[in-house]
């Protein structure tokens, strides 16, 4: 029903509870109502009508007309809904600024922990990363910290979704060799990766397919374990290893792909 949809929208987007939304719809429909009248024309229980109408007035959706029996009329929907959106935008803006300031303060406070002499990953050189979000964060971290060399054999996700992070790492001085699957080339048209390849700022080749997508940044290696079910549910398991011997093994495999790949 149309009435149910109006109530649903008011609840979902304009911070009214169920009884408030029903009461406001009734006020808009009837114009002016007393608490008793509201109970008779809406699904708001009689014992709750006074509280509900006062709450609507406090939120700016209704105006009371004092008298022997208080009457309430609605604020025009166009006015109150627009006002709500404007106030919400301002509130979100303030919250965003507060979060940015909190982030900066936290980073400043955590600097001594980040820059400590203790190795960042302790004695651990192997981490298991699960889920697309965590894998993305780990990849971003690798691009931020790489100093010399990036070797990327990519079947789609990194080149498309983390292009800016990759380009920034190259701009900061890292040399990059990238192999992409040929099916990905069309999606890279007009991209920064393609632009940098044409300008000689990175080396780019394409291969029909490769069994082992990988990312190597200096001594760090990141690769996914094959699990189609996990990939379907965006919970693929990836392994991060920081060890020059493992790096050498993966780099040898990357070089095999590189020799077979065609220059773009």
Swiss-Prot record:
Instruction: Give the chief site where it resides.
Output: cytoplasm
Q: Which Pfam families match?
A: Regulator_TrmB, TrmB
Q: Name one GO molecular function term.
A: DNA binding
Tell me what this protein is called: DNA-binding HTH-type transcriptional repressor TrmBL2
**So what family is this one in?**
Belongs to the transcriptional regulator TrmB family.
> What are the alphabetically sorted keywords of the record?
Chromosome, Coiled coil, Cytoplasm, DNA-binding, Repressor, Transcription, Transcription regulation
The UniProt entry's GO CC annotations, sorted and at most eight, read: chromosome; cytoplasm
Q: Which residues form a coiled coil?
A: 81-113
Q: What does it do?
A: An abundant chromosomal protein that seems to be involved in both genome architecture and transcription repression. Incubation with DNA in vitro gives fibrous structures 14.2 +/- 2.1 nm in thickness (naked DNA is 1.83 +/- 0.37 nm); does not significantly compact DNA. Binds to both coding and non-coding regions; binding within gene promoters correlates with decreased transcript levels, while binding within coding regions does not.
Q: Which NCBIfam families match?
A: tran_reg_TrmBL2
Name its cellular compartments. Answer: Cytoplasm; Chromosome
Species whose genome carries this gene: Thermococcus kodakarensis (strain ATCC BAA-918 / JCM 12380 / KOD1)
Null-mutant phenotype, please? Slight growth delay compared to wild-type. No fibrous chromosomal DNA isolated from cells, DNA condensation is normal. Chromatin DNA is more sensitive to micrococcal nuclease. Alters gene expression levels of about 10% of the genome.
């Amino acid at each position: 029903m149309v009435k149910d949809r109006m109530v649903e929208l008011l609840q979902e987007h304009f911070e009214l509870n169920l009884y408030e939304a029903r009461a406001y719809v009734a006020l808009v429909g009837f114009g002016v109502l007393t608490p008793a009248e509201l109970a008779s024309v809406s699904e708001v229980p009689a014992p709750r009508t006074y509280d509900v109408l006062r709450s609507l007035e406090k939120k700016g959706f209704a105006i009371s007309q004092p008298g022997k029996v208080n009457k309430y009329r609605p604020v025009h929907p166009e006015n109150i809904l627009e006002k709500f959106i404007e106030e919400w935008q301002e509130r979100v803006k303030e919250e965003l600024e507060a979060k940015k300031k909190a982030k900066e303060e936290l980073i400043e406070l955590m600097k001594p922990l980040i820059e400590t002499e203790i190795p960042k990953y302790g004695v651990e050189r192997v981490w298991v990363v699960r889920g697309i979000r965590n894998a993305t964060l780990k990849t971003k971290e690798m691009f931020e910290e790489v100093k010399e060399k990036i070797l990327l054999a990519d079947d789609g996700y990194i080149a498309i979704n983390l292009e800016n992070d990759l380009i920034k790492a190259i701009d900061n001085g890292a040399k990059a060799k990238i192999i992409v699957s040929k099916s990905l080339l069309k999606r890279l048209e007009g991209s920064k990766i393609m632009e940098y390849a044409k300008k000689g700022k990175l080396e780019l080749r394409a291969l029909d397919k490769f069994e082992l997508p990988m990312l190597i940044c200096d001594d760090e290696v990141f690769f996914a374990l094959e699990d189609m079910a996990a990939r379907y549910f965006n919970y693929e398991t990836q392994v991060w290893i920081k060890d020059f011997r493992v790096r050498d093994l993966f780099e040898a495999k990357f070089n095999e792909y590189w020799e077979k790949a065609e220059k773009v």
